[in-house]
Amino acid sequence: MKKFKRRLSLTLRGSQTIDESLSELAEQMTIEESSSKDNEPIVKNGRPPTSHSMHSFLHQYTGSFKKPPLRRPHSVIGGSLGSFMAMPRNGSRLDIVHENLKMGSDGESDQASGTSSDEVQSPTGVCLRNRIHRRISMEDLNKRLSLPADIRIPDGYLEKLQISSPPFDQPMSRRSRRASLSEIGFGKMETYIKLEKLGEGTYATVYKGRSKLTENLVALKEIRLEHEEGAPCTAIREVSLLKDLKHANIVTLHDIVHTDKSLTLVFEYLDKDLKQYMDDCGSIMSMHNVKLFLYQILRGLAYCHRRKVLHRDLKPQNLLINERGELKLADFGLARAKSVPTKTYSNEVVTLWYRPPDVLLGSSEYSTQIDMWGVGCIFFEMASGRPLFPGSTVEDELHLIFRLLGTPSQETWPGVSSNDEFKNYNFPKYKPQPLINHAPRLDSEGIELITKFLQYESKKRAPAEEAMKHVYFRSLGPRIHALPESVSIFSLKEIQLQKDPGFRNSSYPETGVFVINHFTCRS
């Protein structure tokens, strides 16, 4: 052992001490929490921690070098330390040079956690080839943290990041990302300025606000938390779904601020909803604009339905529109992720005028086609300027539906004759009326499409994905179907809003509309 200790001490002598080598290692590891105190040195006085054996200490810093050590007979020194002493040496240093390794020490490849860097150093001073970091730019940071392009970073943040951050080509842990976002200002109420109150509902109050990070307007949906009940289930649903829905035709959830008393959802701010847009047009919209809005509704729904998410509360008040004409689905408070097989859901889910007849008659098992009936009703309303089925009660709503589309029979709607609620109402035997008589501005292709939505049997309703390919949209051109999900249809030069014939204002007003708990709030 004396001979071994002497050889070990000679090996550890170099231009750098163990503390210096480990400090270099620490500089390249990901900082987990930006607000945490400085890490204590791993090694004190050049000795390994007493809780670890010499073998485990050496193995910690040499075991992941990827170059297997040469083996000597165990009788020379001993099996536990032979692998270390047998490694080739150049003078007093280990002859090891790190490449930009792609395999982490935990056995994972590029997906290795950002909390433990692959740039592991030997306790003896080892010069790394990639020690020098290139300067971090705003573009790097935006890409790294998925930030908005117009964000304003706090003064000095980039300089601090330059000193403390690991190389940007390494993976980043969720914990590190949260810490970085928090330091920038996300998740903090002081980042947002309340400008005015837009409205108040049962659980939430909505404010028009401004972000200090981007100087953009935002909608602050402040949900009150009751200590006895916690967050309303509608709020939990909305957050859990929206955080995973990233699409050009779905309202963007920018941030979540959680305090003891409230949960604030920070949304992008849009100027108005479809209901007010139609009101401003005097209920006479350009048929070209009707087509553009309908396509965007279908595009957003198709994205949701591919992910087994049902909106369940489609109505003009839940469709927000900005000055450019971009339409976005909003208010996912009643939305629900649909599992397979289909589960039973609440019977009270959709605003009465846009509720499909199967739900009105008590059906509680449904699929993505539940949303398509509402699409047909909204399509008609945009084209004609009036609601299709403005019933005041469930019976009145069904009466209006049957009077236009004909009272269903066992032939037109299998199973309806055995429905108890249908039998109890005892509706007159209405014959179907031609839809063109009620929506004369729709061409034959539009009538064909709306008929595909207004089917009694839910499984016969045209899915959103299929409807987008209908010949009715042929005039929009082929390129609109190839757009990435996050890209607006208005990025195409051939796609533009036209002036609506009945539009009463010469300029687009800033009205500030946002929807909470089925209550439309306007500034």
From Swiss-Prot:
Bias-annotated ranges (Polar residues): 110-123
What the entry lists under SUPFAM superfamilies is as follows:
Protein kinase-like (PK-like)
- Give the Enzyme Commission number: 2.7.11.22
The record's listing under InterPro entries reads:
CDK, Kinase-like_dom_sf, Prot_kinase_dom, Protein_kinase_ATP_BS, Ser/Thr_kinase_AS
Which amino acids does the record list as binding ATP? L198, G199, E200, G201, T202, Y203, A204, T205, V206, K221
Give the GO biological process terms: regulation of cell cycle phase transition
On the tree of life, the source organism's domain of life is Eukaryota
Please name the catalytic residues of this protein: D313
Gene Ontology MF terms:
ATP binding; cyclin-dependent protein serine/threonine kinase activity; protein serine kinase activity
Write out the entry's keywords from A to Z.
ATP-binding, Kinase, Nucleotide-binding, Phosphoprotein, Serine/threonine-protein kinase, Transferase
> Which cysteines are disulphide-bonded?
none
According to the UniProt record, where is the region Disordered?
31-55, 103-123
What reactions does this protein catalyze? L-seryl-[protein] + ATP = O-phospho-L-seryl-[protein] + ADP + H(+); L-threonyl-[protein] + ATP = O-phospho-L-threonyl-[protein] + ADP + H(+)
Q: In which tissues is it expressed?
A: Brain specific. Within the brain it is concentrated in the neuronal layers of the hippocampus and olfactory bulb, which mostly consist of post-mitotic neurons.
One Pfam family matching this protein: Pkinase
Gene Ontology cellular component annotations, sorted alphabetically: cytoplasm; nucleus
What PROSITE patterns does the annotation carry? PROTEIN_KINASE_ATP, PROTEIN_KINASE_DOM, PROTEIN_KINASE_ST
Q: Which residues form the Protein kinase domain?
A: 192-473
* Residue(s) carrying Phosphoserine: S9, S80, S92, S105, S137, S146, S165, S180
Q: Does the keyword Nucleotide-binding apply?
A: yes
Would you identify the family this protein belongs to, as annotated? Belongs to the protein kinase superfamily. CMGC Ser/Thr protein kinase family. CDC2/CDKX subfamily.
Please name the PANTHER family in this protein's record: CELL DIVISION PROTEIN KINASE, CYCLIN-DEPENDENT KINASE 17
Question: What's the stated role of this polypeptide?
Answer: May play a role in terminally differentiated neurons. Has a Ser/Thr-phosphorylating activity for histone H1.
Task: Spell out the subunit comment.
Answer: Found in a complex containing CABLES1, CDK16 and TDRD7. Interacts with TDRD7.
Name listed for the protein in its UniProt record: Cyclin-dependent kinase 17
